[in-house]
């Protein structure tokens, strides 16, 4: 079951039962995914078979060596079974969360827009290439807009960007790396102002994302 809640004034994805499915492995622990030395970037896309999803997942796969100091998760509005069928059961080098019912999409407010209003020039090129390859789409149907999050310990959301068009999301893994670096840099500056006795060497990612606060261990 996917569930979310608000903690204080900060948004967190929190529920002890929150597990997620990938195309090959069901029931993964979301909070274990959030743990780690590097921040986690979550990118919400339309269904896996959508031309924009295919385009950007392909870009991320091709540029994955540039993803240094960060981690990537793509979320698609498709069932794990549908993605597994489309990929013939192949694994991805980064997690692909399959949220067919759209529980996370609904809670986090992933927006929809009508047809061509969401089409950037880049999106038009993607759709043209897909149409030339035999893909058919309804130009008047609502379209999901992308959402980019940087998530810390226990699902704490550190950064959010709601796309204004279907291609308003990180271009590649180098862009994802720069976003996460900026988030960490900004939080480090805030932490230094709050604790001027700390040096750069004493600040770790748990410090920056407020792990102690979420664990209830700080006074």
Tell me the role of every PLM-derived stretch.
Residues 1-8, 12-13:
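Single conserved hydrophobic/aromatic residue that forms the stacking wall/gate
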